[in-house]
Structure formats: structure tokens, C-alpha cells
Amino acid sequence: MNITGKGAYDTGTYANLFQRSGYREDEIKARLEQTWNDLFYGDEHTRIYYPVGDDKGYMLDTGNDDVRSEGMSYGMMMAVQMDKKHEFDRLWNYAYTYMQHTEGRYKDYFAWHCKPDGTRLSPGPAPDGEEFFAMALFFASNRWGDGPAPYDYQAQARKILHACLHQGEQGEGDPMWEPSNRLIKFIPELPFSDPSYHLPHFYELFAQYANEQDRTFWKEAAEASRAYLRTACHPVTGLSPEYANYDGTPAPVQLHGDFRHFYSDAYRVAANVALDWEWFRKDPWQVQQSNRIQAFFSDIDVSDYRRYTIEGEPFNEPALHPVGLLATNAMASLAADGPDADSFVKRFWNTPLRQGKRRYYDNCLYFFTMLALSGNYRVY
């Protein structure tokens, strides 16, 4: 692993770890295309994308039978990375039409989940959706150019990010980033964070693409999030809690559950850290962190993945999304230079998409890892 020098953003060269592990370019390309086809147009046990009418579509959270801003924005990122404008525009039109608020305390934010018919189930937003929507829209603008509203991608992305930083300044509502420390919040109203929401590699790009007045903020947010992740990830195990205070310590138990431990949301941290390293190579800690989390899981079979304390103590409770956890552990190989990096790439390659009721979250993470390890999760 190249732990010196520049990231892919500067070099234009993205590591193809599948190829490095001995797989042929033609089989890698075929596998990526097949994975897209299975997720978007496969059988009812595998697919998570559903077109609606002439111009909309949604990503279904199959475990909860709803549509989430997380999944919609993930689907858009998948589509722009794969150069699939048709599906991208359908997803965006659905989110824009049914999920994005046009007034009130959540203006320009997205309701975090709704029914497949577009009926909102909760008005409040989940900020990981907004940041993925904005990044996917900027990439779409740069890949395909802008069209008439709502397909004026750049303007739509800037509108979202403006709300994220300035909501409440002229009226009701709260920003999604805490102005005093530049950290993303779990939800706008609460003073703590979710480590898996921290995407410094996105904020580096927001610092170039967002409204000019906010570019310094985004640059500072990238640095703040990198520093935050160093406090939120355990120094021995590499595990992080689902929710954490601004100092990185696990957040208190919430009315809706105990999120102090390493569980579903937290899996994404390993993937985010590794992609930030691949794109920008700004924090050598990310290499050691990736080695740590791979070392922790190196001798644990996927069938035995559990919920863990961040110190590494397993609960009896099995992981709800074991394939998703394997995927993010494998994506850590983008940054890892330890003895487990290659074996995780191969374990992932030999693991199929998840089928059945709980497949949505696993397979979203799976697809991002398929993109990343084939050198196709790129900056546009």
C-alpha cells in the first residue's frame, strides 16, 4: 500500500484491488455490471430498486418496507458512478417530489423515510442523506451537465448544502453541522454526532463545489471530521459507536435505543475512512485504523459476526447485516497495509449479494465496496 504520495484525486489513478488480488479485468468488469443489474433489475429476492410511472423510482428498505433518504441518496451515488443517468434521474425526481421539504423548519431537507407511494412517515431528516444527495448531484452535474429543474444538479446540490449550514438563521429550524466545531450532527436538533456520517472526502469536494461563502467552512469540516474519527474509533480494536458525543465518546442511551456499541450504522466508518485515504491521502492514521479493524475481524467468520462493545466484547446478539460488515471490512483494504488486506478482498469477492428480507443495507454497502475495490468509486 502506498502510504506516501498523493491520492487518486491528485493522480487520477484509482487502485484496482481486485486486479491486484489476481482477478482479471474482464471478470471484474462483468461482476460489477452483474451486481448493478441484480440490485436494480434482479429477482424479487435480490433487487432493491423499483421504477414508478414514467419518471420516478425508489430504493426499498426491504427490512422496514419503506423508502429512506439514506437509500435514495445511495442509489443516486451508485447510478452516477456507473454512468446510469436514467435511473439517477428517476431516483432524484422521487426524492425531490416526495421527500424534500419546501417550507418550514426543514425547508430543503428531506424527510428521512416515507412509504413507497411517497407518503411521508416522519418529517425530520437524517443528515447522511443530505450529504450523499449533494455529492451525487455534484458528480451528476460534472459527468452529464445540468438540465432544467429539477435536473439542474449543481444548483440543487448547492441549495441542500446551504440549508445544511444556514437553517434557522432567518427563521425556524437548525443546521445539520454544529457551527462551533464544524461537526455533522445525528439530527439537526440534537447535540451529538454519528461517526458514520463523517465524510471528509466529500467535504473536501464541497469546499470546491458549494456556494463560495461556505467553502472555508467545508474545508474546516473535512479537517474536523478527520480529527473526530481519531477520537471516535477505539485505539486498539478500531471499533466505533453508532452515536458519539462531540468528543468522540459514546453518546448516552437514547429513548429509541442504546447506540453506544459497534453495530449497523458504525460499519460504514471503515469504508469512509478508507475512501478518504484513497481519494486524498491526508491522514496516515487512516492506514493504521484500517489495519486495526481488519485485525479485529481477521479470525471471525462472517456467520459469527455480532454486536460488539467498542472495546471488542461480543454480545450474544448476532449482526443484523453481516454481509454489509464484511463489505466495509473489505473496503478498508483501500487504506490498510497490514497482513489481512488481501484476504478481505478475496473473502468479499467470494461472497454473493445478500438475498431476502434484510438485504437492503447489506447490499448498498456491498455495491459501494464493489465500486471501490475495482477502482470505480471516483471523483467527478
Swiss-Prot record:
Keyword hit for Acetylation: no
Entry's EC annotation: 3.2.1.156
Thermal dependence summary for this entry: Optimum temperature is 40 degrees Celsius for the hydrolysis of xylotriose.
Noted pH dependence of activity: Optimum pH is 7 for the hydrolysis of xylotriose.
InterPro entries xrefs: 6-hairpin_glycosidase_sf, 6hp_glycosidase-like_sf, Glyco_hydro_8
Broadest EC class assigned to this enzyme: hydrolase
A Gene Ontology molecular function term of the record: oligosaccharide reducing-end xylanase activity
Chain's role: Involved in depolymerization of xylan, a major component of the lignocellulosic substrates. Acts as an exo-oligoxylanase that efficiently hydrolyzes xylooligosaccharides, releasing xylose from their reducing ends. Hydrolyzes xylooligomers of 3 to 6 xylose units to xylose and xylobiose. Besides linear xylooligosaccharides, also hydrolyzes branched xylooligomers, such as xylooligomers decorated with 4-O-methyl-D-glucuronic acid moieties. Its proposed role is the degradation of xylooligomers produced by the activity of extracellular xylanases once they have been transported inside cells.
Protein name from the UniProt record: Reducing-end xylose-releasing exo-oligoxylanase Rex8A
UniProt lineage: Bacteria, Bacillati, Bacillota, Bacilli, Bacillales
